[in-house]
Amino acid sequence: MVGENTDRSALLEKLGVDIDPELLELALTHRSYAYENGGIPNNERLEFLGDSILGQAVTVKLFRENPGLDEGELAKRRASLVSSVALAEVARGIGLGEYLLLGRGENQSGGREKASILADTVEAVIGAVYLDAGGDEATALVLRLIGPLLADPDRFGAAMDPKTSLQEAAAHHGAGQPVYTVINTGPDHSKTFHATVDVGGLVTASGEGTSKKQAEMAAALSAWTALTNHRARTPRG
Protein backbone atom coordinates (compact mmCIF):
# COMPACT_ATOMS: atom_id res chain seq x y z
CA MET A 1 0.00 0.00 0.00
CA VAL A 2 1.33 3.42 -0.94
CA GLY A 3 1.25 5.09 2.47
CA GLU A 4 3.08 2.24 4.18
CA ASN A 5 6.06 2.29 1.85
CA THR A 6 6.49 6.02 1.31
CA ASP A 7 9.51 7.91 2.63
CA ARG A 8 8.08 10.72 4.75
CA SER A 9 11.12 12.99 4.62
CA ALA A 10 9.67 14.90 1.66
CA LEU A 11 6.45 15.48 3.59
CA LEU A 12 8.37 16.82 6.59
CA GLU A 13 10.26 19.16 4.27
CA LYS A 14 7.00 20.52 2.88
CA LEU A 15 5.61 20.95 6.37
CA GLY A 16 8.76 22.75 7.45
CA VAL A 17 8.94 21.03 10.83
CA ASP A 18 10.33 17.82 12.32
CA ILE A 19 7.82 15.49 13.94
CA ASP A 20 8.52 12.43 16.05
CA PRO A 21 8.21 9.49 13.61
CA GLU A 22 5.72 7.62 15.80
CA LEU A 23 3.52 10.69 16.21
CA LEU A 24 3.63 11.37 12.48
CA GLU A 25 2.63 7.79 11.74
CA LEU A 26 -0.26 8.09 14.17
CA ALA A 27 -1.36 11.34 12.53
CA LEU A 28 -1.47 9.58 9.16
CA THR A 29 -3.37 6.52 10.43
CA HIS A 30 -7.00 6.49 9.33
CA ARG A 31 -9.47 4.45 11.36
CA SER A 32 -9.96 2.02 8.46
CA TYR A 33 -6.26 1.10 8.57
CA ALA A 34 -6.31 0.85 12.36
CA TYR A 35 -9.30 -1.51 12.24
CA GLU A 36 -7.64 -3.79 9.69
CA ASN A 37 -4.48 -3.95 11.80
CA GLY A 38 -5.87 -5.22 15.05
CA GLY A 39 -7.43 -2.06 16.39
CA ILE A 40 -4.23 -0.05 16.72
CA PRO A 41 -4.64 3.65 17.62
CA ASN A 42 -5.89 5.96 14.86
CA ASN A 43 -5.55 9.70 14.28
CA GLU A 44 -8.94 10.85 15.57
CA ARG A 45 -7.69 12.10 18.96
CA LEU A 46 -4.93 14.07 17.23
CA GLU A 47 -7.53 15.43 14.81
CA PHE A 48 -9.61 16.64 17.77
CA LEU A 49 -6.59 18.45 19.21
CA GLY A 50 -5.48 19.89 15.88
CA ASP A 51 -8.95 21.22 15.12
CA SER A 52 -8.81 23.40 18.23
CA ILE A 53 -5.30 24.69 17.47
CA LEU A 54 -6.24 25.41 13.85
CA GLY A 55 -9.30 27.39 14.88
CA GLN A 56 -7.40 29.48 17.40
CA ALA A 57 -4.51 30.26 15.05
CA VAL A 58 -6.82 31.29 12.21
CA THR A 59 -9.02 33.35 14.54
CA VAL A 60 -6.09 35.32 15.95
CA LYS A 61 -4.60 35.96 12.51
CA LEU A 62 -7.86 37.21 11.03
CA PHE A 63 -8.58 39.37 14.09
CA ARG A 64 -5.18 41.04 14.02
CA GLU A 65 -4.98 41.58 10.27
CA ASN A 66 -8.54 42.76 9.62
CA PRO A 67 -9.38 45.51 12.14
CA GLY A 68 -12.17 46.81 9.92
CA LEU A 69 -14.16 43.59 9.75
CA ASP A 70 -17.09 42.95 12.07
CA GLU A 71 -17.67 39.72 13.98
CA GLY A 72 -19.93 38.25 11.33
CA GLU A 73 -17.44 38.71 8.50
CA LEU A 74 -14.57 37.42 10.63
CA ALA A 75 -16.60 34.32 11.48
CA LYS A 76 -17.41 33.76 7.80
CA ARG A 77 -13.76 33.96 6.79
CA ARG A 78 -12.67 31.70 9.61
CA ALA A 79 -15.29 29.13 8.68
CA SER A 80 -14.04 29.10 5.10
CA LEU A 81 -10.40 28.65 6.07
CA VAL A 82 -11.06 25.76 8.45
CA SER A 83 -13.63 24.05 6.21
CA SER A 84 -13.03 20.56 4.87
CA VAL A 85 -12.98 21.97 1.35
CA ALA A 86 -10.18 24.44 2.14
CA LEU A 87 -8.17 21.98 4.25
CA ALA A 88 -8.41 19.37 1.50
CA GLU A 89 -6.92 21.91 -0.91
CA VAL A 90 -4.12 22.50 1.60
CA ALA A 91 -3.54 18.75 1.81
CA ARG A 92 -3.41 18.36 -1.96
CA GLY A 93 -0.93 21.22 -2.16
CA ILE A 94 1.58 19.27 -0.05
CA GLY A 95 0.75 15.88 -1.54
CA LEU A 96 -0.56 14.55 1.76
CA GLY A 97 -2.75 11.89 0.17
CA GLU A 98 0.11 9.62 -0.82
CA TYR A 99 1.24 9.34 2.81
CA LEU A 100 -2.09 8.27 4.30
CA LEU A 101 -2.39 4.89 5.99
CA LEU A 102 -5.75 3.60 4.78
CA GLY A 103 -7.58 0.30 4.94
CA ARG A 104 -7.80 -1.67 1.70
CA GLY A 105 -11.42 -0.81 1.04
CA GLU A 106 -10.95 2.89 1.75
CA ASN A 107 -7.86 2.97 -0.43
CA GLN A 108 -9.63 1.25 -3.32
CA SER A 109 -12.61 3.62 -3.10
CA GLY A 110 -10.40 6.68 -3.60
CA GLY A 111 -9.81 7.60 0.01
CA ARG A 112 -6.57 9.39 -0.79
CA GLU A 113 -8.57 12.08 -2.58
CA LYS A 114 -11.55 12.32 -0.24
CA ALA A 115 -11.86 15.84 1.12
CA SER A 116 -13.04 14.71 4.54
CA ILE A 117 -10.12 12.32 5.06
CA LEU A 118 -7.55 14.82 3.79
CA ALA A 119 -8.94 17.60 5.98
CA ASP A 120 -9.04 15.39 9.07
CA THR A 121 -5.44 14.35 8.48
CA VAL A 122 -4.27 17.95 8.20
CA GLU A 123 -5.79 18.58 11.62
CA ALA A 124 -4.16 15.43 13.01
CA VAL A 125 -0.75 16.55 11.76
CA ILE A 126 -1.25 19.93 13.45
CA GLY A 127 -2.10 18.10 16.66
CA ALA A 128 1.02 15.96 16.36
CA VAL A 129 3.20 19.04 15.93
CA TYR A 130 1.63 20.61 19.01
CA LEU A 131 2.45 17.55 21.13
CA ASP A 132 5.97 17.18 19.76
CA ALA A 133 7.12 20.77 19.34
CA GLY A 134 4.68 22.96 21.26
CA GLY A 135 2.07 25.60 20.56
CA ASP A 136 4.30 28.11 18.79
CA GLU A 137 5.47 25.55 16.23
CA ALA A 138 1.92 24.29 15.71
CA THR A 139 0.64 27.82 15.15
CA ALA A 140 3.50 28.54 12.74
CA LEU A 141 2.59 25.39 10.81
CA VAL A 142 -1.04 26.47 10.54
CA LEU A 143 -0.02 29.85 9.16
CA ARG A 144 2.31 28.23 6.61
CA LEU A 145 -0.40 25.84 5.48
CA ILE A 146 -3.10 28.47 4.98
CA GLY A 147 -0.65 31.01 3.55
CA PRO A 148 -1.20 30.03 -0.11
CA LEU A 149 -4.96 30.58 0.27
CA LEU A 150 -4.53 33.97 1.90
CA ALA A 151 -1.93 35.03 -0.68
CA ASP A 152 -4.25 34.27 -3.61
CA PRO A 153 -7.41 36.41 -3.33
CA ASP A 154 -9.18 34.52 -6.10
CA ARG A 155 -8.52 31.14 -4.52
CA PHE A 156 -9.40 32.46 -1.09
CA GLY A 157 -12.71 33.69 -2.46
CA ALA A 158 -13.31 30.32 -4.08
CA ALA A 159 -12.56 28.53 -0.81
CA MET A 160 -14.97 30.86 1.02
CA ASP A 161 -17.83 30.30 -1.40
CA PRO A 162 -16.92 27.82 -4.14
CA LYS A 163 -20.41 27.53 -5.62
CA THR A 164 -20.72 31.28 -6.16
CA SER A 165 -17.16 31.50 -7.50
CA LEU A 166 -17.87 28.67 -9.94
CA GLN A 167 -21.10 30.33 -11.08
CA GLU A 168 -19.19 33.55 -11.77
CA ALA A 169 -16.43 31.69 -13.63
CA ALA A 170 -19.01 29.80 -15.69
CA ALA A 171 -20.71 33.08 -16.64
CA HIS A 172 -17.33 34.52 -17.63
CA HIS A 173 -16.89 31.60 -20.02
CA GLY A 174 -20.47 31.80 -21.30
CA ALA A 175 -21.17 28.32 -19.99
CA GLY A 176 -24.47 28.92 -18.23
CA GLN A 177 -25.42 27.63 -14.79
CA PRO A 178 -23.43 24.74 -13.28
CA VAL A 179 -25.55 21.61 -12.92
CA TYR A 180 -25.06 19.42 -9.83
CA THR A 181 -25.88 15.75 -9.36
CA VAL A 182 -25.58 14.23 -5.89
CA ILE A 183 -25.80 10.63 -4.69
CA ASN A 184 -25.11 9.16 -1.28
CA THR A 185 -23.70 5.86 -0.12
CA GLY A 186 -23.28 4.09 3.18
CA PRO A 187 -25.54 3.43 6.18
CA ASP A 188 -27.91 6.10 7.49
CA HIS A 189 -25.67 6.93 10.44
CA SER A 190 -22.55 7.35 8.29
CA LYS A 191 -23.47 8.48 4.79
CA THR A 192 -20.97 9.79 2.27
CA PHE A 193 -22.27 12.19 -0.37
CA HIS A 194 -20.78 12.27 -3.87
CA ALA A 195 -21.41 15.30 -6.08
CA THR A 196 -20.71 15.85 -9.76
CA VAL A 197 -20.96 19.25 -11.40
CA ASP A 198 -21.08 19.94 -15.13
CA VAL A 199 -20.20 23.40 -16.38
CA GLY A 200 -21.74 23.69 -19.82
CA GLY A 201 -19.68 20.80 -21.14
CA LEU A 202 -16.44 22.71 -20.50
CA VAL A 203 -15.60 21.03 -17.22
CA THR A 204 -16.97 18.13 -15.23
CA ALA A 205 -15.69 17.71 -11.69
CA SER A 206 -16.58 15.72 -8.61
CA GLY A 207 -16.32 16.01 -4.85
CA GLU A 208 -17.41 14.18 -1.74
CA GLY A 209 -18.30 15.00 1.82
CA THR A 210 -20.34 14.07 4.84
CA SER A 211 -23.24 16.26 3.67
CA LYS A 212 -24.82 17.23 0.35
CA LYS A 213 -23.61 20.81 0.82
CA GLN A 214 -20.05 19.77 1.56
CA ALA A 215 -19.93 17.47 -1.46
CA GLU A 216 -21.26 20.18 -3.78
CA MET A 217 -18.73 22.67 -2.40
CA ALA A 218 -15.88 20.24 -2.99
CA ALA A 219 -17.04 19.58 -6.55
CA ALA A 220 -17.47 23.31 -7.19
CA LEU A 221 -13.96 24.14 -6.00
CA SER A 222 -12.51 21.39 -8.16
CA ALA A 223 -14.41 22.69 -11.20
CA TRP A 224 -13.43 26.30 -10.43
CA THR A 225 -9.77 25.25 -10.27
CA ALA A 226 -10.04 23.46 -13.60
CA LEU A 227 -11.64 26.47 -15.28
CA THR A 228 -9.04 28.81 -13.80
CA ASN A 229 -6.12 26.63 -14.84
CA HIS A 230 -7.34 26.18 -18.41
CA ARG A 231 -8.59 29.63 -19.37
CA ALA A 232 -6.20 29.73 -22.30
CA ARG A 233 -8.06 26.78 -23.84
CA THR A 234 -11.43 28.50 -23.64
CA PRO A 235 -12.60 30.28 -26.81
CA ARG A 236 -12.91 34.00 -26.28
CA GLY A 237 -15.65 36.06 -27.79
From Swiss-Prot:
Signal sequence, renumbered to the chain: none
EC annotation from Swiss-Prot or TrEMBL: 3.1.26.3
Ligand binding (Mg(2+)): E47, D120, E123
Coiled coil region boundaries: none
Active-site residues from the entry: D51, E123
Gene3D superfamilies per the UniProt record, alphabetical: 3.30.160.20, Ribonuclease III domain
Boundaries of every DRBM domain copy: 161-229
Major location category of this protein: cytoplasm
Protein's name according to its UniProt entry: Ribonuclease 3
Native source organism of the sequence: Leifsonia xyli subsp. xyli (strain CTCB07)
Lineage: Bacteria, Bacillati, Actinomycetota, Actinomycetes, Micrococcales
